[in-house]
Amino acid sequence: MHHKSLAELASALKAREFSSEELTQHYLKRIERLNEDLNSFITVSTEEALKQAKAADAILQSGEGSSITGIPLAHKDIFCTTGVKTSCGSKMLDNFTAPYNATVVSRLKTAGAVMLGKTNMDEFAMGSSNETSFYGSVKNPWAHDRVPGGSSGGSAAAVAARLTPAATGTDTGGSIRQPAALCGITGLKPTYGRVSRYGMIAFASSLDQGGPMARTAQDAALLLNVMAGFDERDSTSVAQDVPDYTLSLEESIKGIKIGLPTEYFDENLNPGIAIPIEAAIKEFERLGAQIREISLPNTKLAVPTYYVVAPAECSSNLSRYDGTRFGYRCDNPKDLLELYCRSRGEGFGPEVKRRILIGTYVLSAGYYDAYYLKAQKLRRLISDDFKQALTEVDVIMGPTSPTPAFRLGEKSDDPVAMYLADIYTINVNLAGLPALSIPAGFAQGLPVGLQIIGNYFSESRLLNLAHRYQQVTDWHDRIPAGY
């Protein structure tokens, strides 16, 4: 069963080849057997999953249901879920259970999806390797001494290891696309505002965006159909009609203009990555696409800009965790100040503290203009680069990550090297554009991801390009040994 894609599983459920309960039990057994070593799940909701599966079977038996009714899924542990704890990978929320479901969770539940559990992640989504989690590092299924990427590393590893057909993720600077690339799956970051952020614990509110992580573009399209749409409870949600993303999957890509930024193919790119990426681009050329060279001149400013804007927003968002209302509270504080200091000092991990300190510094009275205001101006320039480029081409392509998955612990003591792992993804978030990563080959036996970036609300085109590529390649069907 676990070798089938989400779309294939949905067809099999409709044809009564097996029940949702049988399918759910199959995945729960795989999680029980394989997760202890992989560490991709923080919480497995066995009883609730089987209860939801039985309800889905009743709907399917009546001939009703959506395109994903009865399909087991996993949620990144950043989405609030009633009855199941939401930790955000942090000691601060180790015992927190939300009183409501995130919009993404409720929409998928209403559509009949079954929640297997909550996946591991970098603490408060801050990290590129899934090593900052309070619950320990996630291992890459392709090589257990390598990182799965972050911050949605648990979701990516679980999908790659076939512990779940698909999962939800969030992307603030590459946190869906980078782990998707490193684990050899498909991951889509929608346009900012396309998917509701209600109930998604905030890191950097102007950058955060939820999206699907799955084996194929078709699977991602099926999930996005349900996840996308306006939500009045999210002030940044966009009131724009949601198309059926599956309808455009089979369209011809002949004549589509693909731009290759010169800045994405410079000396920073690992040679092992360049070879499969160039081969993938040639495949698109064979499918009828036109390839053009373009420039995104402010690419090198993206990382420093992001690491002013994101920590500033993080500092503001995480100020709510003070030990007085919810979350971790220190024992026996002497006074209110000690309650604040010790609760935050003991509840947050080192990377989260680092970003809070950076954010507080750049927002301080003496440095606001020098750092934060300047970063917002640079953000506009980065966005303008994309705006200009996308008047010349339909989509932009390049590598998702400059290197394959690196070793666990390799960059833990070098935060700048870790931050540079997102050099090709961060600028997309700063501009609010949609982008996806698809498997495009291997380097040193490890997966390589191809990133496709589009204009605002062009998810249909991105999924169409990805699907057509996956029809003529089999990288997305490769499975790690032992899984």
Curated annotation (Swiss-Prot):
A Pfam family of this chain: Amidase
Enzyme class: ligase
Family from the record: Belongs to the amidase family. GatA subfamily.
GO terms under biological process: translation
Keyword Protein biosynthesis: yes
Keyword Hydrolase appears in the UniProt entry: no
Catalyzed reactions: L-glutamyl-tRNA(Gln) + L-glutamine + ATP + H2O = L-glutaminyl-tRNA(Gln) + L-glutamate + ADP + phosphate + H(+)
Function comment: Allows the formation of correctly charged Gln-tRNA(Gln) through the transamidation of misacylated Glu-tRNA(Gln) in organisms which lack glutaminyl-tRNA synthetase. The reaction takes place in the presence of glutamine and ATP through an activated gamma-phospho-Glu-tRNA(Gln).
Record-linked PANTHER family: GLUTAMYL-TRNA(GLN) AMIDOTRANSFERASE SUBUNIT A, TRANSAMIDASE
Keyword list, A-Z: ATP-binding, Ligase, Nucleotide-binding, Protein biosynthesis
Entry GO MF terms: ATP binding; glutaminyl-tRNA synthase (glutamine-hydrolyzing) activity
Complex formation: Heterotrimer of A, B and C subunits.
Protein name from the UniProt record: Glutamyl-tRNA(Gln) amidotransferase subunit A
Catalytic residues identified in the record: 76, 151, 175
Source organism superkingdom: Bacteria
Gene Ontology CC entries for this record: glutamyl-tRNA(Gln) amidotransferase complex
EC code: 6.3.5.7
